[in-house]
């Protein structure tokens, strides 16, 4: 049996066997020791919006994260649920927006673009920041400067998807991929990791272990907003 007693800057470790004390050691906290691990935050994508049970499992994970939504009615219907669960979100703009009231297209007139932006911002006004897929046709189009201008004048923070880390894995190796990622996080790093809801359910169980050894986990907004 092992017993750890913490008192101020001193820790007493006692190891016993068969009710006999085998080892007793004192450890003292050294204020000169500096944290050697970096900071990580999570953006959880691919929410199971049509699966109530799975969605609740994700929202009930007791860790710090934002969800990632795309402009569509299914996302709109879940906004109050996210709010009640105390979860905030970022909004992704890419080529996959299909619903006409939210759609952004290089073929649209400036007025139609402005109307769509107004609808998006009016519906998802609680988004902490917007993400633009900078590998999308939308980003490369001649309409993007207008989209960017309309967002910035509303005080919306816009970040590029390429500035974010992405955990690409299968269900089998999510833990291994996450552990590989954590090895890349150095002491001065502040990384935002995009991870699918399914994978986050798996890797969230590993987070407390990393926190114990010195890694810091915070909300993505604390990194993105100050950039």
Language model region names:
Residues 43, 47, 100-109, 129-142, ...:
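Second-shell loop/turn segments in exported
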Residues 1-41:
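Non-catalytic propeptide/linker segments at domain boundaries
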Residues 150-176, 217-227:
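His/Asp/Glu-enriched short active-site or ligand-binding loop at hydrolase and phosphoryl-transfer sites
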Residues 39-41, 64-68, 86-90, 126-131, ...:
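Structural preference for beta-strand elements that scaffold enzyme active sites
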Residues 199-227:
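C-terminal domain-boundary segment and adjacent tail
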Residues 110-134, 180-194:
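CE4/NodB-like, metal-dependent polysaccharide N-deacetylase domain
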Residues 70, 92-118, 134-138, 145, ...:
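Long, folded non-catalytic interaction modules
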Residues 27-102:
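Active-site beta->alpha N-cap acidic-glycine motif
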């Amino acid at each position: 049996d092992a017993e750890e007693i913490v008192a101020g800057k001193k820790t007493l470790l006692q190891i016993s066997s068969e009710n006999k004390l085998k080892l007793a050691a004192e450890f003292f906290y050294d204020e000169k020791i500096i944290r050697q691990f970096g900071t990580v935050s999570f953006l959880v994508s691919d929410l199971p919006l049509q699966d109530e049970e799975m969605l609740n499992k994700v929202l009930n994970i007791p860790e710090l994260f934002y969800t990632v939504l795309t402009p569509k009615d299914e996302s709109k219907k879940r906004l109050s649920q996210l709010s009640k669960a105390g979860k905030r979100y970022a909004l992704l703009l890419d080529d996959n927006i299909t619903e006409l009231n939210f759609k952004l297209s290089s073929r649209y007139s400036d007025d139609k673009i402005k109307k769509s932006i107004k609808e998006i911002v009016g519906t998802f006004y609680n988004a902490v920041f917007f993400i633009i897929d900078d590998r999308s046709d939308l980003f490369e189009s001649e309409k993007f400067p207008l989209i960017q201008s309309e967002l910035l004048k509303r005080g919306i923070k816009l970040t590029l998807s390429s500035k974010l880390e992405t955990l690409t894995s299968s269900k089998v190796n999510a833990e291994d991929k996450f552990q590989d990622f954590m090895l890349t996080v150095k002491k001065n790093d502040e990384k935002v990791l995009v991870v699918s809801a399914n994978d986050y359910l798996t890797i969230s169980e590993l987070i407390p272990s990393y926190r114990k050894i010195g890694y810091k986990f915070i909300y993505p907004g604390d990194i993105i907003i100050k950039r």
